[in-house]
Amino acid sequence: IDKNKNFLDVFFSDTIETSLQHENPVIIMAGGFGKRLMPLTKNCPKPLLPVLGKPVIEHIINKLKSEGFKNIFISTHYLSSMIREYFGNGKNFGVTINYIEEKKPLGTAGCLSNFKSNNDKDFIVCNGDVLTDISFSHLLDYHSRNKSIATMAVREYFWKHPFGVIKTNGLKIKSIKEKPIEKTYINAGIYVFKNRITKILKKDKKIEMPDFFRLLKKRKY
């Protein structure tokens, strides 16, 4: 951003590649219909929409590559042929790309039931429309150090009430706060999982990511 607050560029350190190479698979979720961005997504899948001359998903792949993640899987459904045609096997982008094709929409976690890893490493999942400066390496390290089954990246979100908020005790007013600001945490659309957790998913059954986390917690997997 320049001194006049004009947006100039997004920098993801694409040109600064680490010497450390990670074998961990990364699944990029790119199968959604992008309904909220219609009509832009009528003839183009949302992950291929350009930001500063490159598709959103290409920014993600470049960020991953710069951190040494080159074992990439892309989950596709809507207009999947366009994504396959653009990236191919990933050779032109300096990575290896395999595809997980959803024959029907499986939600934000259902495609993991069709994921066949090419190693036994923990894997990262990232939504295909996320522009982020998060360190995937640090997230993976955090996940490993805590010996977690599943890790979700979150971000702080501040929300201002549009009205005065009243707290009561029965019919008595305890306090009044005029349009207070509350801090919460929201899902950032990036996760790390133990490789074996995909076994609890039923093949080709639709499931959303929040429900998947509830399932993991319930089973204490």
Whereabouts are the PLM-identified features?
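Catalytic-core segments of class I nucleotidyltransferases/pyrophosphorylases
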Residues: 123-124, 131, 137-144, 157-159, ...
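Conserved N-terminal catalytic core of the sugar/cofactor nucleotidyltransferase
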Residues: 3, 54-127, 138, 203-204
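Active-site metal-binding loops of divalent metal-dependent hydrolases
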Residues: 33, 128-130
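A short, conserved acidic/glycine-rich loop-to-beta-strand motif
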Residues: 146-156
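Short beta->alpha transition motifs characteristic of CBS
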Residues: 2, 6-20
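A conserved hydrophobic position in a structured secondary element of the catalytic/binding core
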Residues: 11, 78, 126, 168, ...
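N-terminal glycine-rich phosphate-binding loop and ensuing alpha1 helix
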Residues: 18-81
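A structural signal for short hydrophobic beta-strand segments in well-ordered beta-sheet cores
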Residues: 48, 165-168, 213
